[in-house]
């Protein structure tokens, strides 16, 4: 059974920008020819993954759909977060979607992390796929890396 990716894409980027009026969430910042959200979508365009579920708020719908079109992803589900409540409620709401088979493994990915070695990321998931029921992928915070 394929793994269902759930992309957490509701962050507003307020910790990144001091001027809250003129900021863009880091997952949508254009770094020339790519964004972090775009890279996340590329990572899941692999035969081990089912179509994505994207958890976000209504401010980002247009940007998300633009990225989905650019990556030629036609099948997806968007969950709207009614209020900013951090990660746990977004994970819970995605896990409760009735159309997801009970035994389908889920992987929760943040939309604003850079994973440069996509081949190793996918290889590791594929290697352990038969043991997975749920996986939350996070990377260390900058202060943990020092």
Describe each PLM feature range.
Residues 137-146:
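Single conserved hydrophobic/aromatic residue that forms the stacking wall/gate
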Residues 1-7, 14-18, 34-108, 114-119:
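Conserved N-terminal catalytic core of the sugar/cofactor nucleotidyltransferase
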Residues 12, 33, 145:
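Donor nucleotide-sugar binding loop of glycosyltransferases
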Residues 131-135:
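Conserved donor NDP-sugar-binding/catalytic core segment of glycosyltransferases
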Residues 118-129:
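Short alpha-helix within the catalytic core of nucleotide-sugar-dependent glycosyltransferases
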């Amino acid at each position: 059974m394929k793994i269902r990716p759930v992309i957490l894409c509701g962050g507003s980027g307020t910790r990144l920008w001091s001027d809250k009026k003129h900021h863009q969430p880091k997952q949508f910042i254009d770094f020339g020819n790519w964004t972090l959200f775009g890279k996340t979508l590329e990572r899941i365009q692999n035969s081990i993954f089912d179509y994505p579920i994207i958890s976000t708020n209504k401010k980002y719908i247009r940007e998300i759909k633009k990225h989905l079109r650019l990556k030629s992803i036609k099948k997806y589900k968007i969950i709207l977060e009614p209020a900013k409540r951090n990660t746990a409620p977004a994970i819970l709401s995605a896990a409760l979607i009735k159309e997801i088979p009970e035994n389908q493994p889920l992987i929760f990915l943040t939309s604003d992390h850079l994973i440069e070695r996509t081949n190793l990321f996918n290889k590791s998931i594929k290697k352990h796929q038969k043991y997975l029921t749920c996986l939350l992928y996070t990377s260390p915070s900058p202060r943990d890396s020092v």
